[in-house]
């Protein structure tokens, strides 16, 4: 019965919105298999940019790698350690990219070896254009050579930005990177970062494993709400091997409240988004650890069914209810309060595709079972309702035995 129900809810979920005119995100079977091997679930890891910007060096990267092991991040699933912009300074006479010798005196191969020795994967940044966003050498005209170089260094993940590329065709340019990566023979994740300017959800599946859907995130509640709203329209493009990327996490960077960070993390999990920490993981408060290391919320993000959650209730006064079907037949539900006051929100089983009758509800932030609830569709008490703090979230997993 559960398998039949799950098949039905996936069908309803996928057909909830009409196909976009011109949607061409249908990669070949071999491409689907290749991508699924690299990114069967959303990527997890750490990226230097949000916290450190250009203030990076090899000692920092070694300390971050050490911290990701000692603080439990690696065990929780955070695998990739990605160095963003500002690591490169020039090209050698043979055209090869050169890492900053002052900041990275041991070279990238040695640093990759260190990261790999910690049981982590190593990532680097480049740009489609001739220069990166910070004015360092980009990969335009050197795509093949750069991918060979990165493969020789042991790179596992490449983020490719879109600065100085206004006159270029994104599909053509990012395909160059895909083909160059394939020729190296090394499995390397391709992270497409053109900020959603050219509707990547329509063409990026089959080229990269993830693609940005908006401009850069900021450490503010307003930025989170804007990105969540933008990404909510593209859930049909996501799935195993190809993910919408609402950008790196800001959890722990100090610009939001604890409730706002929990909502931020919860919505990223509901949207099956890559979870790339962007804070200083070497020194985290107890609250930051509680958010980033919440195994129950991470499990929603990493669910193998690979469905991006969507909004099923959107109330005009600032409340939303999100749902995400899961591989075991249960449903994750996030009650989000966008308003400035505490709010009561509720859900009926029929609104999230569950059959009527008793269901077990578990709070994923309180880490406790809330008992058995029922919805026979007639009485006020026969639905799950909860109070949600301002700019906060209540996230539950609902499971029926039918």
Where in this protein do the model-derived segments appear?
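Positively charged n-region of N-terminal signal peptides that target proteins for export
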Residues: 1-4
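Bacterial N-terminal signal peptides
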Residues: 7-16
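N-terminal module-boundary/linker segments of secreted carbohydrate-active enzymes
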Residues: 22-58, 62, 67
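Structural recognition of the beta-strand scaffold that forms the well-ordered cores
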Residues: 38, 42-48, 77-84, 121-126, ...
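Aromatic-lined carbohydrate-binding/catalytic grooves of carbohydrate-active enzymes
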Residues: 64-167
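Glycan-recognition surfaces
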Residues: 142-145, 182, 186-280
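Glycan-recognition and catalytic regions of carbohydrate-active enzymes
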Residues: 245, 272-341, 357
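C-terminal beta-sandwich/jelly-roll accessory domains of carbohydrate-active enzymes
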Residues: 312-319, 327-402
